[in-house]
Amino acid sequence: LMKDYLDSKSLPLYDMLSYHLGIHGLDPGLTVPKRNLGILLQTAVKALGGNPSLTLPAAMSIEMLNAFCEIHDDVQSGNPTRNGQDSLWWVWGPAQAINAGDGMHSIARLSILNIDRNHFSDNTAHGAVSFLDQGALVTFEGRYRDLEMQERIDTTVEAYLDMAGQKTGSLYGSALSIAAKLSGHDEKVCEKIFQSGHFIGQARQIKLDITQIWGSESDQRIDFLNKKKLFPVVAVLENATPSQKRKLGDVYFKRVLEDSDLDSVLEVLDDLEGKKLATQQYVTAKNTAFSILKENLPDHSSEHLIDSLETILEE
């Protein structure tokens, strides 16, 4: 569906969108990135008794919104690569990348409004758009908090979890609540399911942070090099000695970080069991999200969704 839409446009702007999505211009040696949010939405529709063949525009919508966030994130972070190839801004420059990202956002809203009105009422369509916009706005709030934390060493676990739930979890909440709305569930259930995304986001972000620090790929460390506060660091700060806090401060207050600075951080994390603390919080967040789904959905529906989310979170 995304390919058909973008191929129907002649302006080179849409070639940029195709490039970012891996539809055209992808190195033959690379694989197209998984559309986790779109797949999750469709999986949820099926699990909740809806018809996935009718909700493809909504799946396209959530993927376009995610792409919008990715493009802007790459510009903000100065990330030169995305999914194994040069990032969009690295090829076309930040100004055109911002145009492309904003275009993705507009397409996301138009796509969900184009769902078949022979099967969905105006009220249902507008409700789905509302959950899309709600997810976008909360994501922006989380990204604001994330950037604000970069120059601070006194970030709390509570503040981090709020940020991660907003920044990373809101689109998962949107995907699930849109699926519930399009499957005929009432507003209260949809709102509860949206809230589960907050904890999915916490778990997902903590997992990514663990990979940033202990993963083997140096190109995965862009967030560390940009001084973003990763959860293991935030978790150990609460019990760190003054000398350990100074050691971390010496790293994070440097003008420019290098890969070698991670060694100093790892010493403190190893002493204070940072990886263990992060793993425990990951499990807590994941279980909280799953409990919300179990409490608000029939057993067969929640079990199917939880299996899908387990797969996404463990990637």
Task: Set out the residue ranges of the language-model regions.
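Conserved N-terminal diphosphate/IPP-binding helix and adjacent helical/loop segment
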Residues: L1-A67, I71, V75-W90, D146-M149, ...
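All-alpha helical catalytic cores of prenyl diphosphate-utilizing isoprenoid enzymes
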Residues: K3-D15, P28-R35, I98-N99, N118-W214
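Structural motif
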Residues: P28-R35, P52-S53, G165, Q220-K227, ...
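Small-residue hotspots
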Residues: Q42, A59-S61, F68, G101, ...
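Structural helix-adjacent loops and short alpha-helical linkers that scaffold large soluble proteins
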Residues: P52-L54, H119-N123, E187, A240-L248, ...
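Acidic, Mg2+-coordinating active-site segments of isoprenoid diphosphate-utilizing enzymes
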Residues: I71-V91, M104, R109, L113, ...
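Short, charged, amphipathic alpha-helical segments
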Residues: H126, S130, E191-F194, G249, ...
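C-terminal charged capping/lid subdomain of soluble metabolic enzymes
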Residues: E267-E315
